[in-house]
Amino acid sequence: MYSIETDNLTKKYKNKTVVDNLNLKIKDGELFALLGTNGAGKTTTIKMLTGLVKPTKGKIKILNLDLENNSQKIKTMLNISPQETAIAPNLTVKENLEFFAGVYQIKDRNEKIEKLVKDFKLEKVIDEKAKKLSGGWQRRLSIALALINGPKILFLDEPTLGLDVIARKELWHIVEKLKGKITIILTTHYMEEAEALSDRIGIMKNGRVIVTGTAKSLMKQAKASTFEDAFVKIVTGEEL
């Protein structure tokens, strides 16, 4: 079964086509990395998939439900961990978790919070105010908050942007543990991140997904020794 399916998904702003007849299928439990240079259409695509922007034309199915006719139900099945960490800076880590659990009216909230604290290893910072946390800890908390309502689909937007190498690798380990449990759509500018984490990668150019495949298959297609080189060749057309 597919978590996400699009059929000729298109978005135009006046005379400019930002997303152009996009056809995409993402499997249940898959970690799918959506890559592309700035202006390729990634952000608009994500906004349409999450119901924040209405398509000019085309269809979106989320968990086999038509998004246009089931938007409220679908919004309870997905969540977003945005590029800018979605945390309350003046609340402690525990208070953030309790607050978001209340917003989502989570049943058995104490049990849910305890599990997230354990999974994200937040014990040592549980009573720290969020604004005093390092970037890495803030990212952990932000992703934990995005999971508190038990979504079936999680959108991770630049989850390790601005983090040092150690904090980035630690967050990778956490994301890897989520693989197979929920569907994850990852957007990132770090090629090594997409290569390390993704089951499959889609590369966008001019509003279209021009290739999909594993990092290894795309490297082979582009005749490149690294995935970063493969990405450059694909988006510039050098491998064609």
Give the location of each predicted region.
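Conserved ABC ATPase signature
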Residues: 90, 129-136
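Conserved ABC transporter NBD signature motif
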Residues: 58-69, 73-74
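Conserved ABC ATPase "signature" region
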Residues: 98, 102-125
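ABC ATPase "signature
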Residues: 212-213
